[in-house]
Amino acid sequence: MKTPITEAIASADSQGRFLSNGELQAVNGRYQRAAASLGAARSLTNNAQRLITGAAQSVYTKFPYVTQMPGPTYASSAIGKAKCARDIGYYLRMVTYCLVVGATGPMDEYLVAGLEEINRSFELSPSWYVEALQYIKGSHGLSGQIGNEANVYLDYAINTLS
């Protein structure tokens, strides 16, 4: 999994040299942001259920047909609603994983790679998850550097789905 730290080390090692001042500065920058990133991951994790429930409700409000259409890919039943919440939770978990490592690697490797195929196979609309992630971004209650760190990966997920 690529992170700013592993990329700096891999580059130096492939050239048989020590880390350059620029690479050391990049590593130091990651360490300086790490506390804010971990704070964001902790807060999103602690508030996950509230955020997921609110995000699902936001999807149902913006796309009411989701709760009216029968079938396994819609939220017209308790099972469908549980699947929707599960999927939103998956995106939120990926955001927290990215916050922990300080890079988009977890999302790229575990989510983005097969996203289009999954959505097509199960007839899932990316716009549902864009709405859910926008709700989470607007409702997480994080501010300052902690909020900025969370928003980097929420925006990345939103842009990937758009």
From Swiss-Prot:
Domain of life of the organism in this record? Eukaryota
Q: What is the disulfide pattern of this chain?
A: none
Its PTM note reads: Contains one covalently linked phycocyanobilin chromophore.
Is the keyword Cell division assigned to this protein? no
Q: Which keywords annotate this record?
A: Antenna complex, Bile pigment, Chloroplast, Chromophore, Electron transport, Membrane, Photosynthesis, Phycobilisome, Plastid, Thylakoid, Transport
Entries under CDD domains matching the protein: PC-PEC_alpha
**Mode of membrane association:** Peripheral membrane protein
Q: Which coarse location class describes where this protein primarily resides?
A: plastid
Q: Where in the cell is it found?
A: Plastid, Chloroplast thylakoid membrane
GO CC annotation, single: phycobilisome
Q: Which GO terms describe its biological process?
A: photosynthesis
| Keyword Lipid biosynthesis on entry | no
Q: Which residues form a coiled coil?
A: none
Gene3D superfamilies per record: Phycocyanins
User: Pfam families this protein is in?
Assistant: Phycobilisome
Report residues binding (2R,3E)-phycocyanobilin.
C84
Q: Which family does it belong to?
A: Belongs to the phycobiliprotein family.
How is the quaternary structure described? Heterodimer of an alpha and a beta subunit, which further assembles into trimers and the trimers into hexamers. The basic functional unit of phycobiliproteins is a ring-shaped hexamer formed from two back-to-back trimers contacting via the alpha chain subunits. The trimers are composed of alpha/beta subunit heterodimers arranged around a three-fold axis of symmetry. The phycoerythrins also contain a gamma subunit which is located in the center of the hexamer.
**Job description of the protein:** Light-harvesting photosynthetic bile pigment-protein from the phycobiliprotein complex (phycobilisome, PBS). Phycocyanin is the major phycobiliprotein in the PBS rod.
Task: State what protein this is by name.
Answer: C-phycocyanin alpha chain
Per the UniProt record, the source organism is: Porphyra purpurea
